[in-house]
Amino acid sequence: MNKSLFKSGCLVRTAHVILTWIITLILFLHNTDLRRCQERGDLLQPLVFSSVLLLSVLLYFTVSLMDPGFVLSDSQTETASGDGDEELEAMIPQEQNSIKQRRCGYCFLLQPMRARHCKWCKRCVRRFDHHCPWIDNCVGELNHRWFLLYLCVQFTAVCWGLQSAWSGFISAPSWQQWFTQNVFLLVAFAVTAVFSVVLLLLLCIHAYLASVNCTTWEFMSRHRILYLKHVDSEENPFDRGVFCNLWSFCCVCGTVAWEKMYIRHNNASV
C-alpha cells in the first residue's frame, strides 16, 4: 500500500481506539452500574466488561491488519501450489472439467473464481466480500470469519455500554439542569445507540451470507458477475446447505478451490 493509504489506515485505527476509550472513561467516571459495582468492591462486572472491550479492540486490529486473501502473483502461486486446498479437495470430488481464469484488468494477475480487484487496496482479493472503511481493509476469504467474530464481540460491548450509559442518567428539576448534568452520558448513549443498530444490521447480514455461502459483492451485483449471470436467480452454485456452509466458513482455514465446487454444481444440474 502507498503512504497515503497507510496514513489513512493509521488515522482510522487511532480514531477507533480513541473513541472506544473516551466512551469507556465516560461510563466509569459517572454514576453508572459499572461505577457503582466498582465502588462496592464488586469487580466482576467491570472486569468482564473491560475484557470484552479489550477483546473487541484486539479483534479490530486483527481484522484490520491481516491479509484478507490477496491474490498472489503467478510466481508466488507456483511456489505455494499444493499448500492451500488439501482440506477442501478431500471434501469435493475431483472434476475433469476446468474453468479458465481471467486476468485482472488492473493488476494483470490471474483471478481465481470469486476474486475481485479492490480499488482502495489496489489488489485482487480472494472471495471478495467488500472493502470496509472502518477497518481500512478488505473483507475476504482469509479474514471474513474474524470480521464476523469481531462484529459479535463489538456488538456485545456496545450494547453493554448502551445499558450502562442509560443506568447513569440522573434526574434534575429542569431540562437545562438535566442536560448539563448528563451531557457526557447523553453523548455516550447516542454514540452507542447508533453503533448498536449498525452493528446489529451488519451482524445479521453477514451471518445470513455465511449461512448461504454468498458474499456482499455477489448478493448486490449478481447481474454483473460473469460466473453468476447464467445461473438461475434463486440458485447459488456455492451453497452446500447451512451446516456445511457454516462449517466451511468457520473451520476451513486457507483458500478454497471454488472452481471445483462450481463445476460440481453445474455437472449435477445437467
Curated annotation (Swiss-Prot):
Pfam families (alphabetical): DHHC (PF01529)
GO CC term, one of those recorded: endoplasmic reticulum
Membrane topology annotation: Multi-pass membrane protein
Compartments where located: Golgi apparatus membrane; Endoplasmic reticulum membrane
Protein EC: 2.3.1.225
Cytoplasmic membrane side: 1-8, 67-145, 204-270
Classification via InterPro entries: Palmitoyltrfase_DHHC, PFA4/ZDH16/20/ERF2-like
Catalytic activity: L-cysteinyl-[protein] + hexadecanoyl-CoA = S-hexadecanoyl-L-cysteinyl-[protein] + CoA
Recorded GO MF terms: protein-cysteine S-palmitoyltransferase activity
Lumenal side: 30-45, 167-182
Keyword vocabulary terms for this entry: Acyltransferase, Endoplasmic reticulum, Golgi apparatus, Lipoprotein, Membrane, Palmitate, Transferase, Transmembrane, Transmembrane helix
Residues annotated as the enzyme's active site: C132
This protein's record includes keyword Signal: no
DHHC domain segment(s): 102-152
Function text: Palmitoyltransferase that catalyzes the addition of palmitate onto various protein substrates. Has a palmitoyltransferase activity toward gephyrin/GPHN, regulating its clustering at synapses and its function in gamma-aminobutyric acid receptor clustering. Acts as an inhibitor of the NLRP3 inflammasome by mediating palmitoylation of NLRP3, thereby promoting NLRP3 degradation by the chaperone-mediated autophagy (CMA) process.
Family: Belongs to the DHHC palmitoyltransferase family.
Comment on protein domains: The DHHC domain is required for palmitoyltransferase activity.
Protein name: Palmitoyltransferase ZDHHC12-A
Name of the encoding gene: zdhhc12a
